[in-house]
């Protein structure tokens, strides 16, 4: 359910962009993201920092897009959000912590060196996406950027998550792998 809530603003943005224009879509994105935050809190009594950062950026850059009638602000939002995530992961590492380990370490046991590699891999991914967005947003037509934002980045993120999952599984202790496999077998039998 939580993952479905994450897609609603993107779907709303894409649909209204195709039906109207970037300004209507941006206004709807702001509203849909606010509703997503409220629903997430109502259902789970917690909102992740990444969601709050994303909402703040959507509200600020989306508001500027609408108020100044300049689509460049919403285009920059994507780059800035990815850059914030990359910087956040890098800073967490510099402070002796791994944000990725903080999110997943309660459920998965891995050596610190592996958590560090995963953390830096995500820093690289977010940095690459931030840079790629600048190119697509400002060198290609708006329609291409909207498709890239909605589909390209989404697919790339899913693919990277899956690759990270395989990497984690490869480095999990044998006992933990067996436990995960047993819990998967039980849920398949139900």
Swiss-Prot record:
Domain of life: Bacteria
Membrane topology: Multi-pass membrane protein
Chief place of localization: membrane
Transmembrane regions: 22-42, 50-70, 76-96, 118-138, 148-168
Localization, UniProt: Cell inner membrane
Keywords of this entry: Cell inner membrane, Cell membrane, Membrane, Transmembrane, Transmembrane helix
GO cellular component, one term: plasma membrane
Keyword Methyltransferase: no
Function: Plays a role in cell envelope biogenesis, maintenance of cell envelope integrity and membrane homeostasis.
PANTHER family: INNER MEMBRANE-SPANNING PROTEIN YCIB, INTRACELLULAR SEPTATION PROTEIN A-RELATED
Record-given protein name: Inner membrane-spanning protein YciB
């Amino acid at each position: 359910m939580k993952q479905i809530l994450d897609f609603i603003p993107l779907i709303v943005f894409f649909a209204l962009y195709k039906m109207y224009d970037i300004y209507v879509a941006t206004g709807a994105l702001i509203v849909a993201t606010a509703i997503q935050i409220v629903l997430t809190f109502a259902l789970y009594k917690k909102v992740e920092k990444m969601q709050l950062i994303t909402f703040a950026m959507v509200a600020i850059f989306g508001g500027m897009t609408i108020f100044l009638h300049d689509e460049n602000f919403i285009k920059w939002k994507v780059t800035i959000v990815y850059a914030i995530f990359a910087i956040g992961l890098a800073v967490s590492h510099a402070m002796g912590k791994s944000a990725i380990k903080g999110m997943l370490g309660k459920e998965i046991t891995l050596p610190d060196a592996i958590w560090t590699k995963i953390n830096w891999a995500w820093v690289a991914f977010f940095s690459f996406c931030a840079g790629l967005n600048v190119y697509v947003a400002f060198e290609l037509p708006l329609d291409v950027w909207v498709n890239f934002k909605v589909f390209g980045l989404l697919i790339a993120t899913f693919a990277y998550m899956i690759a990270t999952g395989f990497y984690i599984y490869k480095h999990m202790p044998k006992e933990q792998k067996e436990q995960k496999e047993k819990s998967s077998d039980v849920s398949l039998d139900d």
